[in-house]
Each structure stands twice: as structure tokens, then as C-alpha cells.
Regions:
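Bacterial Sec-dependent N-terminal signal peptides
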Residues: 7, 13-44
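N-terminal processing/targeting junctions
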Residues: 8, 17-18, 62, 260
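Extracellular distal adhesion/interaction modules in secreted or cell-surface proteins
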Residues: 29-384
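Bacterial N-terminal signal peptides that target proteins for export
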Residues: 1-8
């Protein structure tokens, strides 16, 4: 009997405003003769700022403290992130306790934890001059968080929808990719809920520990271009796929996403000895995460969500494919741009720009990060998360 190896795979993607008070220009014991000319009623409060007690906690998905997380608080200005109000770092207990001065009218602000693995740009209400929230934790976030600042990813692609009935136990649908005739068959690995979160999640999910998160953040610093800081990650000889060397069960675990799009993630397989040379060689794609978006950020995924891909024979290669902004609120639209872990299948005319994922190793786990925008487009940040 062949032994089976467990091959887990993780996916990854200060300003104080001075208060203003009116100064009396006359002797308070000798008021003006014409009080009718006063510009405000008695008791009017001219104070325009307030001091807010801030308590922000950063936790892993198993509620363990994350220290050293940079946290910024911004004003909310017409639905977008405005002026920086305060900046700080969580302590050894994963807590940022501080006082922040902000405009008196502000009842909702933007709190951004610049740390992969934690939801970013959350909307937090202030109540009784306190701002209290937890970023991370088993549910993704808690406290006075009322939502997430939504970036404008545009509407999902509506072409070539794969209906939910086309699941692994309900048949397949044959369609094309990136406008190329392929007759590729699409299906879902399992059913999913109304927000595109798979129903076939493993219980319990995986713990995403502090050490792993720190490694991810050090390896893939957000808003840093991978070609500049780690060109070796996308070198021609860099691994981008999962090559099964002995019979193995394979799982994939969601860690983080920082996309403005509602992306769908799928996988395909082929014999390692005969890699695909064109899109027509991709005969079948199974969707793992119909909507790979975090809870509160146009989705319902939480860090640690784990799905079993299946059992694979030695000599099999597993490739990943991301369909850009393909979740339409109900199904996946495969008319969207598809970006593959096999770089030669990607649409950029310049072959030097075709790699769209990085493949790193952490202990016995592989970490995968995807760039979800065509790399020849000006809007691509090239951070691969």
C-alpha cells in the first residue's frame, strides 16, 4: 500500500487638531449694550475637537496577541479615507491604548492595520468618546466595527456564468478562457453559501500563528513591488505550482486578501512531464473559493478557512488560477480575466510580466501569493498579495 503524505498549502492576498474657543473681547462684568447683535445663543459650545480614548486589539484567528502591528486612524471623508489622525503600534499584549484628538463631529473613522492577515481599512464608530475594536480573532473582527471601506473594483464580469448546479456532484460546464477557444470544463469543488464561502470547509480550520504571519509580512511587504524587493520570487526558475512527488492528500487554506476585486480561485491539474503550452491544454478547472474575499470586505472568508482539494498521484502538478472580479454575487463568471500559476498561459504580451504568483516555503507549508491585476496595466501594484 502506498503511503500518503499530507501536503498542506496556504494561500495567501499623527495629527492632533487644536481646539478652538471664542475669546471674550470685553469685560464679562460689563456686557455689550446690544445683546441682540450676538452671533450665537447663550451656552453655545465652540469646542471643535474631542479627545477619544482608543483601544485597538490585534489577534490571530486563534485569538492570540499580535505585537508590533502598525495601526493608523484616518478621518472618513465622503466615503473615502481622509486625513491621518493618529498612528501607533500594538504592544506585547497585541493592544494599542492611546488618546487621540479628532474633530468633534466625527462619529465614524477608518482604522487601518498595515499587516497581512488582518482586515484593513475598517470603519469604526466612536461612542462616548471611546474607540474600541478588535481586528482579527476567530470571527475576523469585533467591537465597534461597522464595516469596511470598500475600494471600487467595478462590477463583476457578467459573461459566461458557471451556475452553482455545476458542482463536483452536479456536472460540469464547458466554456472558453480569456476569449480563447478552449472547451475547458468548469465546476465547483463543492457548494457554497450566498457570499461565496465554501460549505465544504474542514473543521476545525487551520491556525494561522504569529510566527507564520510575521514571516508572511517580512516576505511580502504590502505596497512594496516584488520585482524590486524580491526579484528571486518571480525569476524564470522560481517554482509556481504544486508538484506532487508521492501520492498525497492536498489542502489549501485561506489566509488573507487585500484586493479591491471579488476574485474567484480555482485549480487545474496535469502530468508534471507534460506541462500546458496553451490555454487549450487546460481541460478542467475546479473552483475552490468562488469569492475569495474577507468577511466584511464583500465576502465571508476568514483566515484559516481550509478546503481539501483531494488525493493526487505522484507525478501530478496542481496549478492555481485566479479569475479577476469574477464573483457576481451569486455565481462565478469565467468571462473574467484568468491569471494562471503557469506563467506562459497569462495574457501579457511581454513574457517578463507574465508571472502572477509567488510560491514560498514556511517550515512544511507552502505559501502562495497572487497578483490579481495584469502586470502590464498601470493600476498593478506588483505586490502579489
Amino acid at each position: 500500500m502506498l503511503s500518503k503524505a499530507s501536503l498542506p498549502v496556504f494561500l495567501l492576498v499623527l495629527l492632533g487638531i487644536a481646539s478652538c474657543k471664542k475669546v471674550a473681547e470685553t469685560d464679562p462684568n460689563n456686557p455689550p449694550a446690544n445683546p441682540a447683535n450676538k452671533i450665537a445663543p447663550d451656552g453655545f459650545n465652540y469646542i471643535t475637537t474631542k479627545d477619544v480614548t482608543v483601544s485597538i486589539t490585534a489577534l490571530t484567528n486563534r485569538n492570540k496577541a499580535i505585537s508590533g502591528v502598525p495601526v493608523s486612524i484616518y478621518s472618513l471623508n465622503k466615503g473615502v479615507r481622509g486625513q491621518l489622525i493618529f498612528k501607533g503600534v500594538t504592544n506585547a499584549q497585541g493592544v494599542l491604548d492611546a488618546k487621540a484628538s479628532m474633530s468633534a463631529y466625527m462619529d465614524t473613522v477608518v482604522v487601518d492595520a498595515n499587516y497581512l492577515g488582518l482586515i484593513q481599512n475598517v470603519l469604526v464608530t466612536t461612542s462616548d468618546n471611546t474607540l474600541n475594536c478588535t481586528i482579527g480573532g476567530a470571527n475576523g473582527y469585533s467591537g465597534n466595527i461597522v464595516g469596511v471601506l470598500q475600494s471600487n473594483g467595478g462590477p463583476a464580469n457578467a459573461a459566461n456564468v458557471i451556475r452553482s448546479a455545476a458542482s463536483s456532484n452536479g456536472g460540469m460546464v464547458s466554456m472558453d478562457i480569456n476569449g480563447v477557444k478552449t472547451n475547458t470544463k468548469f465546476s465547483y469543488l463543492g457548494t457554497y453559501n450566498s457570499n461565496g464561502r465554501p460549505n465544504n470547509l474542514e473543521t476545525p480550520g487551520d491556525e494561522i500563528g504569529v510566527d507564520m504571519l510575521n514571516t508572511i509580512n517580512a516576505s511580502l511587504p504590502e505596497q512594496k513591488k516584488v520585482p524590486d524587493v524580491h526579484p528571486e520570487y518571480i525569476a524564470n526558475d522560481a517554482t509556481t505550482n504544486i508538484n506532487v512527488r508521492e501520492d498525497a492528500e492536498v489542502w489549501i487554506t485561506f489566509v488573507h486578501e487585500g484586493a479591491g476585486y471579488r476574485n474567484a480561485l480555482g485549480f487545474y491539474t496535469y502530468d508534471t512531464k507534460t506541462p500546458p503550452t496553451s490555454l487549450a491544454d487546460i481541460t478542467e478547472i475546479n473552483f475552490i473559493y468562488p469569492n475569495a474575499s474577507l468577511k466584511g470586505s464583500s465576502g465571508e472568508m476568514v483566515s484559516g478557512d481550509k478546503v481539501k482539494l483531494g488525493t493526487f498521484k505522484a507525478g501530478t502538478t496542481i496549478g492555481l488560477v485566479l479569475f479577476q472580479n469574477a464573483w457576481n454575487g451569486k455565481d462565478v463568471s469565467v468571462g473574467a480575466t484568468a491569471l494562471f500559476s503557469d506563467a506562459n498561459l497569462n495574457p501579457e504580451p511581454n513574457s517578463d510580466l507574465r508571472k502572477h504568483n509567488v510560491f514560498l516555503q514556511y517550515k512544511n507549508t507552502f505559501l502562495i501569493g497572487f497578483e490579481d491585476i495584469r502586470r502590464d496595466y498601470s493600476g498593478c501594484d506588483q505586490d502579489f498579495i
